[in-house]
């Protein structure tokens, strides 16, 4: 029993002692895709992030959603296309997080193109959005993982869930 406990403890110490900077790293690229949560339909998104420094990344992202609502007794459908950029700081190095995890936070800015019927009486104008996000990724393979991001203050989404591929 003592041997089993020792092996388990050594394994845990080794697992948490092995850490690195952001899995993306400087000059790395990662592709992200998934679905989001929003008050204006369910967005589908795809994005590309670039490692610009050891712990910093810049990215671009596009999203699409179709949103239907009943307003003054009639049904209206809107389409929203978003184009945004983001900047993130990755906390792996300073928090000594294992390299199969990626914890980050940052800011985003984007423009959201609303397409609504001409007779739509509600609000739904194209707009500029500015927001913040905090997120994490878990890489179950060296280059492939899952991502979860929570955000606010913009027209894009309140949260996102998807996949990440580093190349």
Task: Give each language-model segment a name.
Residues 29-33, 58-60, 83, 101-107, ...:
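Transmembrane beta-strands of outer-membrane beta-barrel proteins
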Residues 47-49, 88-92, 135-137, 151, ...:
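Transmembrane beta-barrel domains of outer membrane proteins
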Residues 19-58, 64, 87, 160, ...:
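Short glycine/proline- and aromatic-enriched beta-strand/turn motifs that initiate or cap beta-hairpins
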Residues 1-26:
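Cleavable N-terminal export/targeting peptides
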Residues 22-31, 61-83, 111-130:
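Flexible, solvent-exposed loop segments that connect beta-strands
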Residues 32-45, 71-75, 124-127, 148-162:
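Solvent-exposed loop/turn segments connecting transmembrane beta-strands
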Residues 35-41, 62-68, 91, 109-115, ...:
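Transmembrane beta-strands of outer-membrane beta-barrel pores
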Residues 21-28, 54-55, 92-102, 140-143:
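Short loop/turn motifs that connect adjacent beta-strands in outer-membrane beta-barrel proteins
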